[in-house]
UniProtKB/Swiss-Prot annotation:
Record key words, sorted: ATP-binding, Cell shape, Cell wall biogenesis/degradation, Cytoplasm, Ligase, Magnesium, Manganese, Metal-binding, Nucleotide-binding, Peptidoglycan synthesis
EC number(s) per entry: 6.3.2.4
GO molecular function, one term: metal ion binding
Cofactor notes: Binds 2 magnesium or manganese ions per subunit.
Record family assignment: Belongs to the D-alanine--D-alanine ligase family.
Location in the cell: Cytoplasm
Cofactor: Mg(2+); Mn(2+)
Listed name of the protein: D-alanine--D-alanine ligase
Pathway listed: Cell wall biogenesis; peptidoglycan biosynthesis
UniProt GO BP: cell wall organization; peptidoglycan biosynthetic process; regulation of cell shape
Reaction catalysis annotation: 2 D-alanine + ATP = D-alanyl-D-alanine + ADP + phosphate + H(+)
Length: 333
C-alpha cells in the first residue's frame, strides 16, 4: 500500500489549545501503529502561525502543501488532515471551511455540522426541531439592562440557572448562578467569551455521555458512560482537565437497559439529523424522574488520558487505530 501523507494539525490558539495538544499526542500514538500513513504534526498558534514539532515555521497552501519558510526545504504534499483542534477554529467549523475550499479531505464533521453543534443557540434549536427534549433556556444577544432583567426572571422562575457563552466549549465562559448577587457579573463575564449567551435552567440530574461514531459506514452509539462530580459542583474546565479533579468517570453507567437504549437511539437520531461524520460525543442529562434531556454535542471530543470517547469506543469492542484508518481510507479511495 502506498503511503499517504497525513497532516496532524493541532493547537488552534484558543482557550483549549493545550488540551488539543494532549489529544494530538493520542492521535500520534495511534497513527504510529499504521505504517501506511506518513504523519507530519503541525501546531497552529494564536497568531495564525504554523510550526512543526522541530520548530520550523511553515504554512498550509491552497495547493495542498506544507510549504516551509526555509526555502531550501522541499514542500510536503498533504493527502489528508486530522484537525485536532478543540474549540476555535476547529470545532467552530472555520478550519473545515478552508479545507473544503481547497478540496482537501479531512477527518471529522464538516464545517456546517461543526458550527451548528458548537453554537449553543443553533444547537438547541436543532435539538428541538429533531424532537429531542433539551434543557429549558433563553438566549441573549447583548449585555444590557434588558438582558439582566430577562435573566433575573429566569432565575426567579427556575430557582437556579447556568449562564453560558454560546460559542465556547469545555465549559469555558460557563457560570452557575443561584442568587441575584452573582447574576450581573456572571452575565458580563459570559459575554466576554461570545456575542451570544444562553441561560439554562439548572437540572439536578446524572450526566451521561455517549460516543457516537462511524465504522464501515454504520453509525455506532455506545452504552452511556457517566460523569460523577463532587457534590454541588458542575463539570467545569478545571474539573475536566486538572490533575486534582474530583470528578469521576464511569465508562459504562449503571442505568436501566430501557433508558440506556433510549439514550442510544437519541444519540443516533442526533448524529443523523445534524449530519455528523466520523466521531462525536453526545451528552445527556438523566433526571430523578428518568427524563432524558440532550445537553450538548461535541464534534471533536477530547482524546486525553481521562477522556471518555476513546475509552467508550474501546469498551464497545472497537480498536481506535483501525477505526481511524477505516474512516480515513474510505475518503481516500
Amino acid at each position: 500500500m502506498t503511503q499517504k501523507n497525513l497532516l496532524l494539525l493541532c493547537g488552534g490558539g484558543g482557550d483549549e489549545h493545550s488540551i488539543s495538544l494532549l489529544s494530538a499526542n493520542f492521535f500520534e500514538t495511534q497513527l504510529a501503529t499504521l505504517p501506511h500513513f506518513n504523519v507530519l504534526r503541525v501546531e497552529l498558534n494564536a497568531k495564525g502561525q504554523y510550526r512543526t514539532q522541530a520548530g520550523e515555521l511553515c504554512e498550509l497552501t491552497n495547493s495542498k502543501q506544507i510549504r516551509f519558510n526555509d526555502q531550501s526545504k522541499a514542500p510536503w504534499d498533504v493527502d489528508y488532515v486530522i484537525p485536532c483542534i478543540h474549540g476555535y477554529p476547529g470545532e467552530t467549523g472555520d478550519i473545515q471551511s478552508y479545507f473544503e475550499l481547497i478540496n482537501l479531505p479531512y477527518f471529522g464533521c464538516d464545517s456546517e455540522a461543526s458550527s451548528n453543534c458548537f453554537n449553543k443557540v443553533t444547537a438547541k434549536m436543532w435539538f428541538s426541531a429533531l424532537g429531542i427534549r433539551n434543557t429549558p433556556y433563553i438566549f441573549l444577544n447583548e449585555f444590557n439592562q434588558q438582558a439582566i432583567e430577562e435573566t433575573e426572571r429566569a432565575l426567579e422562575k427556575w430557582g437556579s440557572i447556568f449562564i453560558k457563552a454560546a460559542s465556547q466549549g469545555s465549559s469555558v465562559g460557563c457560570y452557575r448562578v443561584d442568587n441575584k448577587e452573582q447574576l450581573a457579573n456572571s452575565l458580563e463575564e459570559a459575554f466576554k467569551y461570545s456575542p451570544y449567551v444562553v441561560v439554562e435552567k439548572t437540572i439536578n440530574a446524572r450526566e451521561l455521555e455517549v460516543a457516537a461514531y462511524e465504522v464501515d459506514g454504520e453509525i455506532i452509539a455506545t452504552k452511556p458512560g457517566e460523569i460523577i462530580c463532587a457534590s454541588n459542583t458542575f463539570y467545569s474546565f478545571d474539573e475536566k482537565y486538572a490533575e486534582n479533579s474530583q470528578a469521576q468517570t464511569v465508562i459504562e453507567a449503571d442505568v436501566d437497559e430501557v433508558i440506556a437504549k433510549q439514550i442510544q437511539e437519541y444519540a443516533i437520531k442526533a448524529f443523523k439529523g445534524m449530519k455528523l461524520r466520523h466521531l462525536s460525543r453526545i451528552d445527556f442529562f438523566l433526571t430523578d424522574e428518568n427524563e432524558i434531556l440532550l445537553n450538548e454535542i461535541n464534534t471533536f471530543p477530547g482524546q486525553t488520558q481521562i477522556s471518555m470517547f476513546p475509552k467508550m469506543l474501546q469498551n464497545h469492542g472497537h480498536n481506535f487505530a483501525q477505526y481511524l484508518s477505516g474512516n480515513i481510507m474510505a475518503q481516500l479511495k
